[in-house]
Amino acid sequence: VKEKSVRVCVGIFCLFLLTPAMPLRRVASAPSPETYKQDAQGLEKQFEPFLKAFQKGDDKGMDESFGVFRLPKPKEWFGNYFSVEDAAKLSSVYDREITDAESSLIEDMNRADPGSRFRVRCEPRGESGAGQDSSGGYGLRPVKPIAVEQFRLEFRSGSHDQKFSFIANFVYVDGAYRFVGGGGAAFWAKPEAGR
């Protein structure tokens, strides 16, 4: 009996040595969000799901796909760049800013060519002082510089060649451009931001 148990132990030991190591099982995690290049083509690609949803008249799809332009953690992001008081103000109005931007874009597309397939062309205007207070002291001033990238966005319909364009400001955070205001400056640098 003792000899049999020794053989079994030796057999198990040999089996252990000859068996290749089993790969460790990976824990399933949430898929990572898509990342986009930090250039005009990356921004154009970022708009594609939204433009497809618009063509289909898919309101839910438009809302979901426009979400990529939102700061992932606005309170934390504003807290990194502004005083505590200003960060609280900005994070409380940011949702309205992004919702208004989406609504305005949809209105412009409907005016230009409702239900059409649009393409966007993004022309960089460079990194500028668009994120700094350029309003004569009425806006909110960041405590450290913010790399705001400004683009001229031209939307052109595929069916009737209708087009419109505007200037928009973005920050590049976590692999995507995040909208921070239209026109010549980020929303916090405009006079109404401090009110």
Where are these regions (language model features)?
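N-terminal secretory signal peptides that target proteins for export/translocation
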Residues: 1-6
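Bacterial N-terminal signal peptides
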Residues: 9-20
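Short, low-complexity N-terminal intrinsically disordered segments enriched in polar/charged residues
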Residues: 24-59, 71, 75-76
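Conserved catalytic-core segments centered on acid/base and nucleophilic motifs
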Residues: 47-57, 62-65, 171-172, 177-179
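Surface-exposed, charged secondary-structure patches
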Residues: 78-163
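Short beta-strand edge/turn micro-motifs at domain boundaries
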Residues: 141, 152-154, 160-191
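Short acidic DE-rich linear segments
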Residues: 193-195
